[in-house]
Amino acid sequence: MGEPFRHSLRVRYNECDPQNAVFNANYLMYFDIAVSELWREALGSYDSMVDSGTDMVVAEAKVRYLTPLRFDDDFDVVVTVSKLGTTSMTSALAVERNGDVVAEGTLRHVFIEAGGGGKTPIPERVRKALESYTA
């Protein structure tokens, strides 16, 4: 069992809606940033995977909003790889402010041949790198 990946961010003014809360779509942006940073820590570079012939796309995204974030809030996005399938990876994500979960969700990525090809198995190098973040 691995440890979750944690990435810290701060709400910027342009991410808020007229109610002074983070606009809902921005939580998916936060999820994407955290997964990109996990990738950087685990593999060094997303481009290295693409250069070796594999890419990935989001096939499914889900967010549950619990309490709004507001301008200038510091928060963490916590990522756990909850499932590594043959051609897909599911991540569980939590947005935490001061240790309290304010939003949670899942992302399912499907691995494809680089350049827009069809589904392909998760490369062994990627699988091994992600195991330390797997629940």
What is each stretch, according to the model?
Residues 38-88, 102-103, 110:
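Hydrophobic beta-strand-centered segment that forms part of the acyl-chain substrate-binding groove
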